[in-house]
């Protein structure tokens, strides 16, 4: 039996209007939920589309990177297979070309012979090239050939030639004379100091005797080969100065100039070298160095004293003294952390007792440094003393430094008098000392064995060589020339005599042992 909804409603306790309202609200609620879920579904579908697009983009980037990796590996493999050195036909019979020789020689100038060999080995291994590497003996011989050839070549500027001359010694009585040539007409612009490339090594020669007569002979030989110079620049040694006078017979306007820095050091020595307070400081620096170099004050250890040219190397000592004075007066300094006040005073407090003297010495050093820089960069010319006076200024506070300034200015004024209008000449041998330094760097630990045939390399150390230079030099100078030069200048060396002494002793010991056995 079918029951109508109207009849069914009659059974409900709630009125029909209430039931209708509930049903309507339920329908509205469900409709709202459906709408909300539809929106959420749309959002999720949008996010999914974005993620799919991002994933697709990443996949494309990965594919591109994979292609780049493949291409890089292909190029690497191709490079490994195709690395070739420039064409370099061999010179002579040793199998190495001018390019390889110049490369090895230039490396040796910087890192030594053994270092050059190791550098070449590392470089060729990195390139994946299997080829022969020249040995240190070959590189040494090449550098000697280049050096000897350099000294054999004529000059084209004898009219403006300035010769710098000095001696150097290492062990024993033997000294080496080094003569450098500078073209005064091609000096660097004012404000720039001479460099090694402005120099030519004219002669490097060992000898046991370098008296005035010996130097006269060497000056004459230099003039025969290169022409009479415009000037000879020396450090003030008597034999160098007096020996050069012979050149005035060849050229009346020849000048003998003294190195400014050596002169300044001599003046400083005369002003403060005999000061008892200065001597006391020197002694206390030595004892202080010994007492603190293995303590918590090790970072405040004074510099090692210079055994030679002490008054040319005061800057380091004075810098230490002024720093120590400041630390004593500045307890909060970071450099004093971890050092008790009583320890500071015990080991370094003595420096404060010389505060007034240190101020004088430091002003003298600052004056000398400024003057040396001026001479190095400007040279000697008419008016140099006037410009030097302007550089020094008139604010010196101490009588000692004021007297030093007067004497330095007077020295330059006297030296510039013979110069022609517009002429500029070097007045510093620092570049010569630096040239000796290049040789000592190459020589390294061998300096304890005295001078050897390695000296032949010195002329080739002043500037980098080129393949073209190697070809020309090797065509003129052979390995036999190196042997002849060595036999002439080094018939024996300290090392060879040392070996001979040991050999003689061993021979005598064997004879004595044999005779004792017979008895």
Identify the residue ranges that each predicted region occupies.
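RNase H-like nuclease fold core
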Residues: 18, 25, 71, 78, ...
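Short, charged amphipathic recognition helices of the HTH superfamily
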Residues: 107-123
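Acidic/histidine-rich catalytic cores and adjacent linkers
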Residues: 33-48, 52-65, 69, 237-247, ...
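Acidic, low-complexity intrinsically disordered segments
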Residues: 1-56
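Structural motif
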Residues: 10-12, 92-96, 427-430, 449
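Eukaryotic helical DNA- and histone-tail-recognition domains of regulatory proteins
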Residues: 97-109
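Hydrophobic/aromatic interaction determinants used to assemble and anchor large protein complexes
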Residues: 281-282
């Amino acid at each position: 039996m079918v029951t109508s909804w109207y009849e069914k409603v009659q059974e409900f306790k709630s009125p029909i209007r209430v039931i209708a309202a509930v049903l309507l609200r339920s329908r509205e609620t469900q409709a709202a939920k459906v709408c909300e879920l539809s929106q959420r579904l749309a959002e999720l579908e949008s996010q999914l589309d974005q993620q799919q697009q991002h994933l697709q983009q990443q996949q494309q980037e990965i594919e591109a990177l994979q292609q780049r990796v493949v291409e890089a590996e292909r190029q690497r493999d191709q490079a490994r297979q195709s690395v070739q050195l420039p064409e370099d036909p061999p010179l002579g019979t040793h199998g190495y070309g001018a390019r390889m020789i110049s490369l090895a020689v230039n490396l040796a100038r910087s890192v030594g012979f053994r270092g050059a060999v190791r550098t070449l080995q590392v470089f060729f291994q990195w390139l994946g090239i299997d080829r022969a590497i020249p040995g240190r003996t070959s590189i040494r011989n090449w550098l000697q050939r280049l050096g000897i050839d350099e000294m054999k070549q004529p000059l084209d500027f004898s009219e403006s030639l300035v010769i710098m001359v000095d001696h150097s010694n290492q062990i024993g009585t033997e000294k080496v004379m080094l003569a450098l040539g500078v073209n005064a007409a091609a000096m660097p612009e004012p404000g720039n100091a001479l460099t090694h490339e402005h120099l030519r090594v004219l002669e490097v020669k060992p000898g046991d005797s370098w008296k005035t007569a010996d130097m006269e002979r060497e000056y004459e030989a230099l003039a025969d080969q290169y022409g009479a110079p415009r000037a000879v620049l020396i450090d003030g040694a008597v034999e160098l100065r007096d020996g050069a006078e012979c050149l005035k017979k060849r050229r009346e306007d020849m000048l003998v100039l003294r190195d400014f820095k050596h002169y300044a050091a001599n003046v400083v020595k005369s002003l403060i070298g005999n000061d008892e307070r200065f001597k006391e400081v020197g002694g206390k620096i030595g004892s202080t160095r010994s007492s603190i170099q293995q303590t918590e004050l090790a970072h405040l250890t004074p510099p090692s004293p210079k055994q030679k040219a002490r008054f040319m190397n005061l800057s380091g000592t004075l810098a230490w003294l002024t720093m120590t004075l400041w630390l004593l007066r500045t307890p909060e300094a970071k450099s004093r952390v971890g050092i008790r006040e009583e320890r500071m005073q015990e080991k370094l407090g003595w420096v404060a007792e010389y505060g007034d003297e240190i101020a004088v010495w430091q002003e003298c050093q600052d004056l000398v440094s400024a003057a040396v820089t001026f001479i190095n960069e400007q040279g000697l010319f008419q008016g140099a003393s006037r410009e030097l006076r302007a550089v020094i200024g008139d604010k010196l506070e101490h009588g000692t430094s004021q007297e030093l300034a007067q004497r330095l200015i007077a020295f330059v004024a006297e030296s510039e008098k013979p110069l022609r209008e517009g002429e500029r000449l070097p007045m510093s041998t620092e570049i010569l000392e630096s040239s000796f330094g290049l040789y000592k760097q190459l020589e390294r630990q061998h300096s304890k064995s005295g001078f050897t045939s390695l000296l032949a390399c010195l002329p080739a150390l002043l500037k980098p060589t080129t393949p073209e230079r190697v070809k020309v030099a090797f065509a003129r100078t052979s390995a036999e020339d190196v042997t002849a030069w060595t036999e002439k200048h080094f018939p024996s060396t300290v090392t060879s005599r040392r070996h001979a002494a040991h050999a003689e002793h061993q021979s005598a010991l064997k004879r004595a042992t044999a005779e004792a056995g017979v008895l």
